[in-house]
Amino acid sequence: MTLRVAITRAAPEAQKTAERVRARGAEPVLAPLLTIMPCGYDTSTEGAQALIFTSSNGVHAFPDARGARNVPVLAVGEATAAAAREAGFADVRSADGDVNALAALVKTTLSPAAGKLIHIGGDHVAGDLSGQLSAAGFKVERRVAYAAVAAHAAPPAFSEPLDIVLFHSARAVEAYLALGAPGAGRLIAGCLSPTIAKAAAEVSWKRVITAPSPRENDLLAATIGG
């Protein structure tokens, strides 16, 4: 029987995940729990030694990559780094992990004396990146480029037969719980990180699977196989 996999992340990344799910022989079902709403914000990079992106949504919300293409970019993971390269940034480095790994990458490759850092992200950020970097002597300017707005009603997909639901952020889990965790007891929750799995543990699932590393391919391998 073909596994039916609910994808809770927002567009446009949801479509990319759907393609990867389909490539592994499962049936993707779009079930967005968040909508990404761009915010007007200061896009100037003057005086910045580097830009920091904690999600690909932040990259998509940056309107003038060509104007800043020579500013180094530090990204939380490979998906975000790939989005930055596609947007035209020339010097892109990936922490290949979570916010803690990103903070470590900044501290080992950059100097506080070289200029400020601009962190472009959403209205909700996992962890305390600014706090860690400020404690290490860096000046960090946080720019809120988008808001992740939670769904007010459960997507229709949760009324259909499903086997697995994928969570790429704790924010998506929070939105799911706020909707009453529809069908959780019969579903496998696939979580991209331990932080997300901890949020999901607020309710009972058929099973909770955590990716061995915060990479989508690892998440799909752990939940779907193939």
Indicate where each model-derived feature is located.
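Signature of uroporphyrinogen-III synthase
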Residues: M1-G226
